[in-house]
Amino acid sequence: NNGEIYAMANSTSYNLESPRDDKNLLKKYSQSQVNKMSEKEKTKAFNEIWKNPIVSNAFEPGSTYKPFTVAAGLEEGILKGNETYYCDGYQKVGPHTIHCSHRSGHGLITLSQSISLSCNDALMQIAAKEGKNVFARYQKNFNFGNKTGIDLPGEAQTASLLHDAKDMTAADLATSSFGQSFNCSMIQMGSAFCSLINGGNYYKPHVVKQLRSSNGEVVSNIEPTLVKQTISKETSDKLRKYMKETVDSGTGTKAKMKDYTAGGKTGTAQKIPRSAGTYIVSFCGFAPVENPQVLVYVVIDEIQRDSQTNTGLAVEIAKKVLEGSLKELNVAKSSKK
């Protein structure tokens, strides 16, 4: 509701007191690899481990993007909320056969189930009905392709990593509907997702809340910056309901909590080259559903091969962070589950 970022973390760490110590490189490289590095190569290696991937890296978001596709349809009146779709496991798009993750098909499903069950087939049908102009306009409306303006250096440039409407093919539209064939950063997704669930308010993300002098006196407070309205409150309310269904009975059931209602969207994106069979799995979760106070976004890059398409670990991590955060912030428990 204000763009504040409480915490960021990633698996690559280094000693902040001695950032140029070669020992820091051993968390990513072997000793023999470090010994063979030239000074130029070592500088490049240090820059890689110092980089904040949440802000600086871009990747295909996968199914965490699906609520945005649905949001565009609801906001434009193309969708009413009572639609049903038949998933037979794939869509033929020109010469291409594009599969749903559920290869045998979900059968007849509702609009809310297109999100809660994460159905690619239904999302392709929705995007086709919207058309490429509406789809591309809402991508930009949610600020994908633009920098968020976060108060940290090295934010990724992603303007060239989205399809323009004029260049978007039918296959591009189909795959973009479920978060593939374009890239974004975690901070872009997190900021946009907040506007999906908070009534449509897109805030500039920031990590600094307050500036203080050397003796501890407050010099200035960083006030929230409302950038734009992305969708209506009515559309936002519907999406929260759909994403609660994801946790209650869909792909995100491992995020269920004892004391709070929760919602969210799981994501699986196959990395390029597709033939390598490697995936990014993720979960964007929030709580409580009736008045979201915390959003947690977890991304696991190239999870162990035996669980490549299993988003469960990302969901479990997000649940733990949500529970701890809600307790730390003294958020009132949900009255209704």
What are these regions (language model features)?
Residues 1-64, 68-300, 310, 331, ...:
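Beta-lactam-recognizing serine transpeptidase/beta-lactamase-like catalytic domain environment
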Residues 231, 306-317:
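Short alpha-helix boundary/capping segments
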Residues 302-304:
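Short beta-strand-to-loop transition segments that serve as allosteric relay/switch motifs
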Residues 327:
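Glycine-rich loop/hinge motif
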